[in-house]
A protein has these predicted regions:
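Glycine/threonine-rich beta-strand-loop-alpha-helix active-site module
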Residues: 41-70, 125, 129-175
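Glycine-rich oxoanion-binding loops at beta->alpha junctions
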Residues: 1-14, 61-112, 119-121, 148, ...
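Accessory alpha-helical/coil subdomains and C-terminal extensions
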Residues: 51, 103, 114-116, 122-131, ...
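N-terminal phosphate-binding or glycine-rich loops at protein starts, especially the Walker A/P-loop
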Residues: 9-62
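Short, ordered loop/turn segments at secondary-structure junctions
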Residues: 26-28, 49, 54-59, 90-91, ...
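Short glycine/serine/threonine-rich phosphate/pyrophosphate-binding segments
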Residues: 30-40, 61-62, 94-98, 118-126, ...
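Short glycine-rich or small-residue beta-strand-to-loop segments that form or flank ligand, phosphate
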Residues: 20-30, 84-87, 110-116, 187-190, ...
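C-terminal non-catalytic interaction/assembly regions of soluble proteins
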Residues: 262-329
């Protein structure tokens, strides 16, 4: 089975079907942003389209008109790079829709791929709602889900979430090992995920955590008390075993009141000197350095699907216009 072929121009589309397609990163950086951009760019070039990378998100477009025509060599090594080579931030197009429309028209964009998480979804929604005021936004636009939180509406998988889980497994295993070495220590680990408990739930499952706190299942005094009683029972039965370290997982948005530090303090107070607690916050380390193999595979599939959607949308429009012209004639 061949996974590549010579660039012999056999896949080039007719000149009238070639498009200018913009690619932009929106939101927090995550693994596989670059891999998806590379896949979309290479697909576009193989078909004769012109891919434009919008640099530094919508703020870069609005302030500086930062668009760059992407070539083969520009994205050649992007498949294994984390972060965002184009640059990304949380700025939304609503900050200056007029400037966004101006640059879209200036570069004659005929399709847009927005890669990111919930902010990317929000940006797509804003552009769609502004179509009546800015006709250029009537082009086909897609949101390619890419966020460690895996919380983009209407999607089942987001790029970067698998890489995040792999990083957290190693992190939590190291934390639990430290807790075990101290025999009587509990770690409360705070993980990212926004308002989705996906990351916290999976990490709690694969690392053997005693409790997991997510936004979907709110923390209250009763549940916390039950978890502490379970913790006491576990320590009572361990009798100083060398694997007696314990761990709680808390999503960053699980509660505004019961913070990671507060939960750790409550556990320490309940221990009455029999066991102690610590907090561990991996922070932006969770975004990972290099995308996992799964994220890389999905990045290619998602990138190509986005391009195919834009192609099919424009083909449908051309066919409809052709029919109207023929009827008029």
């Amino acid at each position: 089975m061949s996974v590549s072929k010579n660039d012999d121009d056999s896949q080039l589309l007719p000149v009238e079907e070639r498009l200018n397609i913009g690619i932009i990163h929106v939101g927090a950086p995550t693994a596989a942003l670059n891999a998806a951009t590379r896949a979309a760019t290479l697909y576009c070039l193989s078909k004769g389209h012109t891919p434009y990378g919008i640099q530094n998100g919508f703020s870069g477009l609005i302030r500086h008109g930062s668009l760059k025509k992407l070539e083969w060599l520009d994205v050649e090594e992007w498949h294994n790079l984390g972060g965002s080579e184009l640059g990304t931030n949380r700025t939304l197009p609503s900050s200056d829709l007029g400037s966004v429309a101006y640059y879209f028209q200036l570069y004659k964009l005929q399709g847009l791929i927005i890669i990111g998480g919930f902010e990317a979804f929000h940006a797509l929604n804003e552009l769609t709602e502004a179509r009546n005021d800015y006709p250029i936004f009537n082009m086909p636009m897609t949101c390619l889900p890419a966020t460690v939180s895996n919380n983009v509406p209407g999607t089942e998988y987001s790029l970067g979430s698998d890489t995040c889980l792999n990083v957290l497994v190693n992190y939590c295993d190291a934390v639990k090992q430290s807790a075990s070495a101290s025999r009587r220590r509990v770690f409360v680990v705070e993980v990212q995920g926004g308002n989705s408990g996906y990351i916290a739930s999976y990490i709690g499952l694969v690392t053997g955590s005693l409790a997991v706190y997510t936004p979907e299942d709110k923390i209250n005094l009763r549940s916390l008390q039950e978890d502490i009683e379970l913790l006491k029972d576990n320590f009572a039965s361990d009798v100083g075993a060398n694997r007696s370290g314990k761990m709680f997982i808390r999503n960053e948005n699980a509660s505004e009141v019961y913070t990671t530090e507060l939960i750790a303090d409550i556990i320490k107070e309940a221990g009455s000197g029999k066991f102690e607690s610590r907090t561990a916050v991996p922070g932006h380390v969770q975004q990972g350095r290099q995308p996992s193999s799964m994220d890389r595979c999905y990045a290619v599939r998602f990138g190509i699907k986005c391009c195919e959607f834009i192609e099919n949308w424009n083909k449908t429009v051309r066919d409809e216009v052709k029919v109207v012209i023929e009827i008029c004639l």
